[in-house]
Amino acid sequence: MNNLSRKDLALVSLMLFSLFFGAGNLIFPPFLGQSAGTSTWVTMIGFLITSVGFPILGVVAVAKSSGLHNLASRVHPLFATVFTILIYLSIGPGLGIPRAGSLPFEMAVRPFMPEGLVSHGLALFIYTFIFFSVAYWLCLSPSKLVDRMGKILTPTLLILISAIFIASIFKPLGSYGEVTGNYIHSPFVSGFLDGYMTMDTIAALNFGIVISLVIKSKGIEGEKAIVKNSVKAGIFAGGLLIIIYSMLAHLGATSGGRFGATENGAQTLANVMLYIFGDGGAVLLAVIFTLACLTTCVGLITSCSQYFVTLSSKVSYKAWVRILALSSMILANM
């Protein structure tokens, strides 16, 4: 078989979208829109090149090379080993995975916790324990990831974000705010740099192997067929990212006209949610942050475990999942 069915292509594409769409992707566009104001759409062109275009190219490059190690081997075998290990460690257990567990708590749960209910440390521990337990369970069966993420987690996330945008149409925030900072003189370049800061270009080097393995599990064989289907999934996922990023940037731009400048994108989103949904907006925001970070966390743990198991057959895939989930939970609480 050379082509994924429409259903499988949609599921793989949704899974790829959810792998990329983490907490940073949720807060960058609103903050960009608020800061860029009337120059939002010029800024977004630059942002989309590095936050969508580059990552999709990365997925295709890794798929075509049958893994990051093979891609880097074109330089030198030793370089490939060192480079690949550093990439997986830095974007995985060294930063990305622990941050995926702690960031939604700090951004969307802690600010709305009743004072004196429980200590910050205990609340964070409880949250991250539940978070990484769910992530661990999801990662145990890589073959089921596409169904669990593509059928449940990602559609839920998309529905919730779309609901915010639709609600903002019926309860508009206002007009676009004024252009501020670097966006005044160089909106395109500023957006270009902001898009790179999502770190998805680097993450794509990790996720490429996950997508290739998922496509193979659907009965696709041969390098050309895998690359072809990776491109299709990338285009579909990229289109979804563009739509969602544009929605979030619009919300941020209109919030600037009503609330003025905020310190970060999380605060911008919090203002929008409270204005549109009232107190219930805090709960909705916490759910969105958690889902966005959970899907990215699952992708990182899976990709890192898949690679590390190739370095030593003495440690199984499930053991690596256990090690990464536990160590990341500990780091998230430090």
Where are these regions (language model features)?
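Transmembrane helix-boundary motif of multi-pass solute transporters/channels
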Residues: L9-F47, L57-A61, S65-L71, I211, ...
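Membrane helical hairpin/interfacial module
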Residues: A36-G37, W41-F125, F129, S133
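Select transmembrane alpha-helical segments in multipass membrane proteins
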Residues: R6-L16, W41, L78-I91, L122-F129, ...
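Hydrophobic, membrane-embedded alpha-helices of multi-pass small-molecule transporters
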Residues: L11-F21, A167-G174, Y183-L251, A286-T296
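Membrane-water interface regions at transmembrane-helix termini and the short interhelical loops
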Residues: V62-L71, F131-L153, S217-I220, I330-M334
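Helix-loop-helix connectors at the membrane interface of multi-pass transporters/channels
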Residues: L32, S102-L122, K216, C297-L324
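Transmembrane alpha-helical segments of multi-pass small-molecule transport proteins
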Residues: L11, L48, V52, F83-L86, ...
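TM-loop-TM module centered on a large, flexible mid-protein loop between adjacent transmembrane helices
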Residues: H69-S73, I244-L294, T310, K314
